[in-house]
């Protein structure tokens, strides 16, 4: 499998309706987290009503523990308040408590929390990369990256991943630590996030060589995390970007899994907040319509191409794919210094996030509309892109 974060196979089947609230059902074989759920509130809920609902949940949960001798559950853990209005929470509840929550008229739906993890398909040190040259040229086989000297200056890229080695020489002091929603180690002990960050803003490997990089850690040293933790990272990035200027921000999510309405809604909230979001299509060689957050239409979904301008054999495809970008045997930074070669739609996606940052530096505007700009600039070269899939490969418009 490709080096993309993947929920082992988490797929949305039917949605059952219990007294007004949907409890999303998952197919057999899903690796859900025992007794852990994500609850999403109705659209337009006020902060006051949300606080009232949360108080009711906490009171009811405590009473259950005391009166009924219910087995110990952690109750509510994370609360989500996206600036665009999406509200919800996640926590550890037994079935009876979830049934009580589902009866509430202010609940939109409930989804089982699930595990996410990353899988590498190849790794080789110190091999020349080709992706940058391809982004800056209209013909394959080049060895030079042509780009404007602004190089994304003034833009900020939020890398929602395993963290970033912010001390790596590639970042020249432009990388900072943002937030951690998975463990107590503010470092990239996996390597995936540093590689992604290097492709966006590294001085050698980056598409936008002067952009700032912010590490948002949602996956641990084993590349494992949860949908609920990823959503926390998405919320934090949205709020931080809005405080600093969303029109100067891009976000990268080289992760995903099978369909999750909660993940899609959170991705849509990032876009609604004015931040350009690039997401990996997935590495299962299937239609990305069943993947999340890749299937969210308001974001920029990226498939992976080869050096010969073909579809990478692992890459997902389909109508939800917006563009192709180099994703096979890509060289970028690794924690502790130096570089490594990785493949996957995880590697394609930061080329697009980096191009978004690059265009911001050129004064082309920001926000989710950048995806349309990138598609307009793309070149029609991908061979055998897959059923109902674009054949457009990204290009930075340098004219070479």
Swiss-Prot record:
InterPro entries: PCSK9_ProteinaseK-like, Peptidase_S8/S53_dom, Peptidase_S8/S53_dom_sf, Peptidase_S8_His-AS, Peptidase_S8_Ser-AS, Peptidase_S8_subtilisin-like, Peptidase_S8_subtilisin-rel, S8pro/Inhibitor_I9
Keywords of this entry: Glycoprotein, Hydrolase, Protease, Secreted, Serine protease, Signal, Virulence, Zymogen
Enzyme Commission number(s) of this protein: 3.4.21.-
Main location, first listed in the record: secreted
Positions of the propeptide segment: 21-119
SUPFAM superfamilies tied to this protein: Protease propeptides/inhibitors (SSF54897), Subtilisin-like (SSF52743)
UniProt xrefs under CDD domains: Peptidases_S8_PCSK9_ProteinaseK_like
Stated role: Secreted subtilisin-like serine protease with keratinolytic activity that contributes to pathogenicity.
Protein's name in the database: Subtilisin-like protease 7
């Amino acid at each position: 499998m490709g080096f993309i974060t993947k929920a082992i196979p988490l797929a949305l089947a039917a949605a059952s309706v219990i007294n007004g609230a949907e409890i999303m059902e998952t197919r057999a074989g899903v690796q859900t987290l025992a007794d852990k759920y994500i609850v999403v509130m109705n659209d337009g809920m006020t902060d006051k009503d949300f606080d009232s609902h949360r108080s009711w949940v906490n009171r009811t949960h405590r009473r259950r523990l005391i009166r009924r001798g219910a087995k110990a559950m952690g109750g509510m853990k994370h609360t989500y308040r996206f600036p665009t209005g999406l509200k919800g929470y996640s926590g550890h509840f037994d079935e009876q408590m979830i049934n009580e929550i589902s009866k509430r008229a202010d609940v939109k739906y409930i989804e089982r929390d699930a595990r996410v993890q990353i899988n590498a398909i190849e790794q080789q040190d110190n091999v020349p990369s080709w992706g940058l040259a391809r982004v800056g040229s209209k013909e394959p086989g080049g060895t030079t990256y042509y780009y404007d000297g602004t190089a994304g200056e003034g833009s900020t890229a939020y890398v929602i991943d395993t963290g970033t080695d912010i001390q790596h020489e590639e970042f020249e002091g432009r990388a900072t630590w943002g937030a951690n929603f998975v463990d107590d180690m503010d470092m990239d002990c996996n390597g995936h996030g540093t590689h992604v960050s290097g492709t966006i803003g590294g001085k050698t490997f980056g598409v936008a060589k002067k952009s700032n990089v912010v590490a948002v850690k949602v996956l641990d040293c084993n590349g494992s995390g949860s949908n609920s933790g990823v959503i926390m990272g998405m919320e934090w990035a949205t709020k931080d970007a809005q405080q600093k200027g969303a029109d100067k921000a891009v976000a990268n999510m080289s992760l995903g899994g099978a369909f999750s309405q909660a993940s899609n809604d959170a991705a849509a909230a990032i876009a609604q907040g004015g931040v350009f979001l690039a997401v990996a299509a997935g590495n299962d060689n299937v239609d990305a319509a069943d993947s999340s957050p890749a299937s969210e239409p308001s974001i920029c979904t990226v498939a992976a191409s080869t050096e010969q301008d073909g579809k990478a054999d692992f890459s997902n495809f389909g109508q939800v794919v917006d563009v192709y970008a180099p994703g096979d045997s890509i060289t970028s930074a690794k924690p502790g210094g130096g570089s490594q070669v990785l493949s996957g739609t995880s590697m394609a996606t930061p080329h697009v996030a980096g191009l978004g940052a690059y265009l911001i530096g050129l004064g082309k505007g920001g926000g989710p509309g950048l995806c349309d700009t990138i598609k307009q600039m793309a070149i029609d070269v991908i061979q055998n892109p897959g059923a109902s899939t674009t054949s457009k490969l990204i290009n930075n418009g340098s004219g070479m």
